[in-house]
Amino acid sequence: MLGVVGVLLLVAFATLLLWDFLWRRRGNGILPGPRPLPFLGNLLMYRGLDPEQIMDFVKKNQRKYGRLYRVWILHQLAVFSTDPRDIEFVLSSQQHITKNNLYKLLNCWLGDGLLMSTGRKWHGRRKIITPTFHFKILEQFVEIFDQQSAVMVEQLQSRADGKTPINIFPVICLTALDIIAETAMGTKINAQKNPNLPYVQAVNDVTNILIKRFIHAWQRVDWIFRLTQPTEAKRQDKAIKVMHDFTENIIRERRETLVNNSKETTPEEEVNFLGQKRRMALLDVLLQSTIDGAPLSDEDIREEVDTFMFEGHDTTTSAISFCLYEISRHPEVQQRLQQEIRDVLGEDRKSPVTLRDLGELKFMENVIKESLRLHPPVPMIGRWFAEDVEIRGKHIPAGTNFTMGIFVLLRDPEYFESPDEFRPERFDADVPQIHPYAYIPFSAGPRNCIGQKFAMLEMKSTVSKLLRHFELLPLGPEPRHSMNIVLRSANGVHLGLKPRA
């Protein structure tokens, strides 16, 4: 009897090996890449790899296998590219808009919002949200950028002694959180003055937990995470409930306000208790929108508001923090920025800025663009192929995860001379143009960042506000890039501040 069982087990094992070989053969002949092991694929390559090593790992593979290569993670085929031709083919397509499996990590928080949805649902939501970034609404948002940046300056005054390194990342994080809450939900959460508020703490808790799950691949599988990390799973669920409850309460309150208002009054015509015209927020647009004649449900709206809260504070925090770091390390750039700010905004540091003012800060825009090149907030972009795809004559089967190494591409010497140097003049109008998909810090194509104009205005407003009040000093250690959900620094982003006379 035991002999029969042994034979059956041996046959089963041999069948699995044969299936494994045949399954992988469909991908191994496509592109160059490391030789996979049975069952495990190339999983062992990632053993011990921490977030600070990921980009060097991608560069090493690129040197060895070329700009387009494949790896196997268990039985999942993954293709990597750092070639703008491949990236253009994928990102410009209306068919390949499904995010790859890694993004599923965010489902617990964001649900099926604009970042996560695909197909007809994504098209419908994108069409609804696009008007939120119309010129007239952005103009109203600039006032919020300016006011919340002023709070940031006030909070930093006591720390600006000209000799103490400040980790600017958490400071900018709270500022960005205040800005996105007021612009997306139309409500002030005062995160900068009350960083221990339950909602603010919940955002920080979930972000930190998701970062850990991103780093440890096995924790990305939800049931494994809950089985092996039950305390963290409960903490994550509790924090998500706090955020969802908060957003849902805001939605209910705003919906009731709209219902109770006169039918003749539009949100643009509403005024507050001071007699000032009420600003439109993303939430107002969503509450008044319909898809196929039906209004969005509260859950639909919550997904979109939560998506904006995530994308509007984490990526912006990364972008602004690294930009301030670069300015602090390049005094000639800082001096030129100061002159431009005086020329455009004047000498009165308390005077509010306008949308037109921010548009005239041309050199600052170059500085921000160059910082985004060196420190892209989203270092990788992923897609999942629902059908067979041919890229440069290479057949790639359906079910493949396709990852675009934006961080590596933006430092490629073929497209950027002296790529590790900070040179804002790269973006001067008279500089010869490079491949349009070689510089895509906001992604590109139909799924590009819908809020990139919003983000650029927010960055200009925040950076200019700091420079009007402080000199940025090169204090503290150099940041160590850490590839998480967004680009961070493992040791913070440090600089010094000295009040301007």
Swiss-Prot record:
Keyword Membrane annotated: yes
Main location per the UniProt record: endoplasmic reticulum
InterPro entries attached to this UniProt entry: Cyt_P450, Cyt_P450_CS, Cyt_P450_E_grp-I, Cyt_P450_sf, Cytochrome_P450_Monoox
Enzyme category, top tier: oxidoreductase
Binding site for heme: E311, C449
Gene3D superfamilies the record matches: Cytochrome P450
Membrane topology (UniProt): Peripheral membrane protein
Key word Heme present: yes
Record-linked PANTHER family: CYTOCHROME P450 4AE1-RELATED (PTHR24291:SF187), CYTOCHROME P450 FAMILY 4 (PTHR24291)
Name the UniProt record assigns to this protein: Cytochrome P450 4d2
Natural source organism: Drosophila melanogaster (Fruit fly)
